C-alpha cells in the first residue's frame, strides 16, 4: 500500500509551493457516477454541464494551475486515505508519482525523473 508515500508527495508539493498536479481532480469534466466534483457542482446547482459552471469555480479545482488545496473535496476518501493524509510517510522527499495499469506506483524526486518514468511506462504500453 502506497497511501502514506502518496500523501507525502502531496505534503511535499504543498510545502514547496508547487501545484498538486493531481489527475484525480484533472478528470473533473467527466460526467459519470464516480466523479465527485462534476456530480456535486453540475447537478445540484443546476449548471447542467461542466462548461456552464462559472470559470472561477472550475479553476478552484484545477490542481495543475491552482496552488494549494482545491476549493473542496475531490472524492470521498476511505479511512486508510484519511490516516495517510494525517500521518504521511516520514523522510520521504519525492515530489512526483505515476501509476501504471498494473497497479504499481513509481516515485520520483525531480520532474526529469518523473518524465523519464512516464516515457518508460508509455513505451511499455502500461501508462494509464
What are these regions (language model features)?
Residues 1-128:
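Bacterial extracytoplasmic/cell-wall-associated proteins, especially those involved in peptidoglycan
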